[in-house]
Amino acid sequence: MELVVTSRETDKKSLLKKIRQTGGIPAVIYSGGKSLANIVVDAHVFGKFLSSLESGALSSTIFSLSYEGRTIKALVKDIQYQVTSYRVIHLDFEELIEDRDVKLNIPIRCINAVDCVGVKLGGSLRQVIRAMRVVCKPKDIVPCLELDVRSLGLSQTRKLADINIPAGLRPITPLKEVVVTVSRR
């Protein structure tokens, strides 16, 4: 996802309020744990993108930020919402550097849930874990991990160890944890 961002002033609440009123989202780009730049993201463009995104996929989405003539590859590390309207009011981006490891959550998608044997026998499919915490290089980031649940019967489970994890991803979450279960109703 490409975003054109602009520079902004720092630390004054009145300026942040004005940015939000004029259709912007205040944001910060971090690199190596330190603040790299204070920026403004177009709220309409980001909101439109966010509404088209699958649930949980934001954490593994790589953004190309066009900032002062250069392109910065980054992940969203934190997002703040307004309590009553659920409007995005602040973003934190983490710059991706090619040779540096990054920690992130990769969403887990259950595929073939409609054809699940346990569901056809009257069971209820419940996904317990929706994302796996991993460490990897930026080039190894995948949009999601898939778990085939077609053969899952009644009272059976699938663990993180059952997911085909691509080379380059090193799980932080213990692989013995249950991802999905089919229980009797």
Swiss-Prot record:
Family annotation (Pfam families): Ribosomal_L25p (PF01386), Ribosomal_TL5_C (PF14693)
UniProt keyword RNA-binding, yes or no: yes
Keywords: Ribonucleoprotein, Ribosomal protein, RNA-binding, rRNA-binding
GO molecular function: 5S rRNA binding; structural constituent of ribosome
GO cellular component, one term: cytosolic large ribosomal subunit
Gene3D superfamilies linked to this entry: Ribosomal protein L25, beta domain, Ribosomal Protein L25, Chain P
Domain of life where this protein originates: Bacteria
Family annotation (NCBIfam families): bL25_bact_ctc, PRK05618.1-4
HAMAP family reported in the protein's UniProt record: Ribosomal_bL25_CTC
Protein family membership: Belongs to the bacterial ribosomal protein bL25 family. CTC subfamily.
Role summary: This is one of the proteins that binds to the 5S RNA in the ribosome where it forms part of the central protuberance.
Assembly, per entry: Part of the 50S ribosomal subunit; part of the 5S rRNA/L5/L18/L25 subcomplex. Contacts the 5S rRNA. Binds to the 5S rRNA independently of L5 and L18.
Record protein name field: Large ribosomal subunit protein bL25
